[in-house]
Design a protein with these regions (language model features):
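Membrane-embedded alpha-helical segments and adjacent helix-loop junctions characteristic
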Residues: 1-41, 132-140, 150, 157-236
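Hydrophobic core segments of alpha-helical transmembrane domains in multi-pass membrane transport
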Residues: 1-3, 90-101, 117-131, 149-162, ...
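Structural signature of hydrophobic alpha-helical transmembrane segments
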Residues: 21-26, 48-62, 109-124
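C-terminal transmembrane helix pair
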Residues: 49-102, 119, 229-306
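Membrane-water interface regions at transmembrane-helix termini and the short interhelical loops
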Residues: 71-77, 100-108, 125-140
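Alpha-helical transmembrane segments and their helix-start/interface "positive-inside/aromatic belt" motifs
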Residues: 77-85, 137-151
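Interfacial loop-to-helix junctions that mark the boundaries of transmembrane helices
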Residues: 106-116, 139-144, 172-181, 273-280
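Membrane-helix boundary/juxtamembrane motif in polytopic membrane proteins
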Residues: 142-147, 215-218, 241-248
Length: 306
């Protein structure tokens, strides 16, 4: 339904600008319809893969999940700090998506041209969050509810088709295909949090050393590890974090969240050869975001001390 709607509205405008409409789906998280939308709209399969997996796993996930969920869970003290971290992560977003795009097989010239709308949207988000945070958050929540509603309708239609054999929407993927992807995500999730816990125990001393160097306590350094598994535990722990820890962990979530969990499981289920591009893009973008947040907080704390 979304694909058909875009075909008659925004897609002609994209083609007029010589941009591949496959990039449009990148505003949705890859596992919330972004990947399928990119693949359906793309003129070049490589652009569909890049938009659906790399952009959808970073910018799309931030728009449809991380921001609305984070702002809904956090208190008044944490919200401005969380927003500052998201701004830092968005500033570093080009690093992650360019690395991922190159590993998807795109030339640097094509990558830069096709990514222009993504960069523009990231700039608009940065301006909006810094100047009109309350209005932006309300907009994100409404957008997320629309996506959830569309997903619920899709599940209902898929279930009806599965039980009756009547295909109401010929272009819609079958329920069996969707459940296969969900199973792949579930299998990866089974071991992801235990994996993060094992890493925390094995790397306790190195993590403490890194934390001392960048000014993070135990909870802050643990959040950087848990964040690559899931955003939810990290956001929940932010109520107990200090300012620097909140900002740096929020910055990581823009590109790094679910890197070794839901996003990895999804890509293994739909396009396994793109796994390397996904991991490299999310890792480099996440590290760049944390570094950007670290620099911002050093300047903020330095100016405060004067």
């Amino acid at each position: 339904l979304v694909s058909l709607g875009l075909e008659y509205t925004i897609v002609p405008f994209y083609r007029m600008l010589h941009l591949d409409p496959g990039m449009l789906g990148g505003i949705l998280a890859l596992d919330m319809g972004g990947y399928q939308l990119c693949k359906e709209l793309a003129l070049d399969p490589a652009i569909g893969r890049y938009g659906g997996i790399i952009v959808g796993a970073t910018l799309g996930c931030t728009i449809t999940f991380t921001i609305p969920v984070g702002m809904g869970m956090l208190g008044e003290r944490e919200k401005p700090l969380f927003a500052k971290g998201i701004l830092a992560g968005l500033s570093a977003l080009p690093v992650g998506i360019l690395v991922g795009g190159l590993l998807c097989g795109l030339s640097i010239e094509k990558l830069l041209i096709q990514s222009l709308p993504v960069f523009l949207l990231a700039v608009l988000l940065i301006l909006g969050l810094s100047r009109f945070p309350d209005g932006m958050i309300r907009g994100f929540r409404v957008f997320a509810e629309i996506i959830r509603g569309a997903g619920t309708i899709g599940i209902a239609l898929g279930a009806f088709s599965y039980m009756t054999g009547v295909q109401l929407l010929p272009e819609m993927a079958g329920l069996d295909e969707a459940l296969g992807v969900v199973s792949s995500i579930g299998i990866v999730l089974l071991g992801s949090l235990p994996f993060a816990e094992i890493l925390q125990r094995l790397l306790k001393k190195p993590l403490e050393w890194v934390g001392e160097k960048i000014g993070l306590g135990r909870l802050g350094t643990a959040g950087l590890l848990v964040g690559i598994v899931s955003a939810l535990p990290v956001i929940a722990d932010m109520k107990q974090m200090n300012e620097r820890e909140i900002v740096m962990n929020a910055a990581l979530l823009v590109c790094g969240t679910s890197m070794v969990a839901a996003h990895l499981g999804f890509v293994l289920g739909v396009d396994a050869p793109a796994t390397g591009a996904l991991l490299a893009g999310k890792l480099t973008g996440g590290i760049a975001g944390v570094w950007m947040a670290w620099q911002i907080m050093k300047k903020t704390e330095s100016s405060r001390d004067r």
